[in-house]
């Protein structure tokens, strides 16, 4: 997975982005191209990571930041 420059906007490290993606606990399909993943950084802090073309040959993380309240509801879904 590539990490696009916009994913670094909020100061999340590449290592934390990749860790959150590899250990994601929820996937939220935002639209046909964008999937938000909820996963933990290397220190356990929850992150939201936006990935374009997640099922394609060249997925790109374009967003990463600490998990916002609006995504909390997805944590309680099975």
Give the role of each language-model region.
Residues 1-78:
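Ribonuclease/tRNase effector modules and their secretory precursors
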């Amino acid at each position: 997975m590539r990490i696009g420059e916009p994913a670094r906007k909020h100061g999340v490290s590449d290592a934390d982005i990749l860790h959150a993606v590899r250990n994601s606990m929820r996937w939220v399909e935002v639209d046909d191209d964008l999937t938000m993943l909820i996963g933990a950084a290397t220190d356990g802090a929850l992150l939201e990571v936006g990935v374009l073309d997640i099922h394609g040959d060249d997925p790109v993380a374009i967003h990463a930041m600490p998990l916002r309240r609006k995504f909390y509801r997805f944590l309680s879904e099975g």
